[in-house]
A protein has these predicted regions:
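Walker A/P-loop NTP-binding motif
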Residues: 1-18, 132-134, 165
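Conserved Walker A/P-loop ATP-binding site and its immediately adjacent core
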Residues: 19-43, 152-157, 301-303
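Conserved P-loop NTPase motor "coupling/switch" region that bridges the ATPase
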Residues: 41, 47, 55, 67, ...
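Conserved two-lobed SF2 helicase motor
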Residues: 69-90, 298-299, 337-352
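SF2 helicase catalytic motif II
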Residues: 96-145
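Interdomain linker/hinge connecting the two RecA-like lobes of the SF2 helicase core
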Residues: 119, 125-126, 155-162, 171-174, ...
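SF2 helicase/translocase ATPase core recognition
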Residues: 140-172, 177, 211-240, 342, ...
Length: 443
């Protein structure tokens, strides 16, 4: 929000229209929709996410004007992995990988500002991401680098980020910086001086522990992501609609009641297909968090999902129905006390209540339960006595699936939570009513 406010304020105070716009947002793939939503919420501005459909024409949204003379769109969003696709024309693979070996798309010059979310992903000048972001940001009026962990390993992590910001010369240039601040076995020297110079040059930090009294003690946000199981999901959704039509047309109340359970099963199937399809996006998010030096609590339901996550993150610990009591306790103790244990994966039945996991202040849900109370209980594994930071909860929702609808019901209306206090039949009837409402236009 602060970056959005800063770029908007710069624009409003600029003597010449457009000094800070258009703006390019570079962020992890899982956060693109969130950035789009935040620009709309806090600045009232539409943002376009770059994809294959607008790969050749995205600039036209800025060049075309509305009746008041302003561009149709001034905010464009992409992820790190897509920089090559949208902004790099060619890379000379025969020569050493430097800025001179990269030919950028001329449309890069259109942007006047760049916001880089999770900028520690650009900390190496030897990677394509680091070089591409550097080239894109060169000569821009405003560049905002956002990260909770600007230094992941040692002081050398700041070099490329300062270079991207156009600030490395303020520290004497590369050689002087390395000599002054990267000496010794830990490549960290004159740390207090570096801290002072950063604060007085280009660095601003709001520590959660110091501003917690001004912030909500627990925040929730949903991240809409593409699923890799779209074809399978659409087929299952079509079957669901067919079944609901039969249910709707059934005249006998007893027949309708007997079909309640089947509708529940099919709704659960849709959730499962969506969950499997979100694994890729969730893995990218998890890598971003733990690579930034933070810990993460991750909740899911399916054994298949947990197995895939465990395969991607072999050092993660788990609290699931497959773990015995000793294994579960070991997982909790390791996560709480071992700084190298960054990820714990839990299902709701085994880990959703009772555990204290205050070593993390981030909780993510690749799947979520039917009830608000279960969601809240899971969130509170981190948000409990002993937690010093604001807790952030992330709900991953599959794009064009039932996820968003279910999330809204759970978080806002709490209809399902109320239903659970009744009998099983009441819960099933509630689910059927929700399904009928969700697919009403298709029945």
């Amino acid at each position: 929000m602060q970056a959005i406010c800063a770029v908007v304020k710069a624009h409003k105070e600029a003597p010449i229209y457009g000094e800070s716009f258009p703006v390019l947002v570079i962020c992890p793939a899982a956060l693109k929709v969130n950035w789009q939503r935040e620009f709309k919420k806090f600045a009232g501005m539409n943002a376009i996410i770059l994809d294959d459909r607008n790969r050749q024409s995205w600039q036209s949204f800025y060049e075309c004007k509305k009746s008041d003379g302003s561009p149709l769109c001034e905010v464009f969003i992409t992820n790190y992995e897509s920089l090559n696709k949208f902004f790099v024309r060619a890379v000379d693979k025969e020569s050493k990988f430097t800025m001179k070996s990269i030919a950028f798309d001329q449309r890069v010059s259109l942007f006047r500002s760049v916001i880089i979310d999770e900028s520690h992903k650009c900390k190496s000048s030897k990677t394509q991401q680091g070089k591409f972001v550097e080239g894109i940001c060169k000569g821009k009026r405003y560049v905002f680098a956002l990260t909770g962990t600007p230094v992941v390993n040692n002081n050398t992590d700041l070099i490329q980020q300062l270079k991207i910001l156009g600030r490395l010369e303020d520290f004497g240039g590369y050689s002087r910086y390395v000599e002054r601040y990267c000496d010794g076995p830990k490549q960290a020297s004159n740390v207090k001086e570096l801290n002072w110079r950063l604060w007085n040059t280009c660095f601003f930090r709001r520590e959660k522990s110091k501003v917690l009294t001004q912030l909500p003690d627990k925040t929730r946000q949903y991240l809409t992501v593409d699923i890799t199981t779209t074809k399978e999901y659409k087929a299952a959704e079509a079957d669901m609609v067919k079944y609901l039509k039969k249910y709707k047309n059934a005249s006998d109340a007893q027949v309708q009641k007997s079909m309640n359970g089947a509708v529940m099963v099919q709704m659960q199937l849709l959730k499962q297909i969506s969950a499997r399809g979100k694994i890729k996006a969730v893995c990218e998010f998890v890598h971003d968090v733990i690579d930034g030096g933070e810990k993460l609590i991750l909740f899911g339901y399916l054994k298949e999902v947990v197995a895939e996550l465990k395969k991607e993150f072999p050092k993660a610990v788990t609290v699931t129905g497959s773990d015995n009591v000793n294994q579960k306790q070991y997982a909790v103790d390791s996560f709480q006390n071992n700084p190298d244990c960054k990820l714990i994966i839990l299902n709701f039945k085994s880990g959703g209540t009772g555990l204290t996991l205050t070593a993390a202040s981030r909780v993510a849900f690749i799947e979520f339960p039917w009830t608000f109370s279960d969601c809240e209980q899971a969130e509170d594994r981190a948000h409990r006595n002993g937690q010093k930071n604001n807790v952030n909860c992330y709900y991953f929702l599959g794009k064009d699936t039932i996820d968003k609808y279910m999330y809204d019901v759970i978080q806002t209306k709490k209809n399902i939570a109320n239903g659970v206090t009744g009998t099983d039949d009441q819960v099933e009837e509630n689910m059927v009513n929700l399904a009928m409402d969700l697919f009403r236009d298709k029945l």
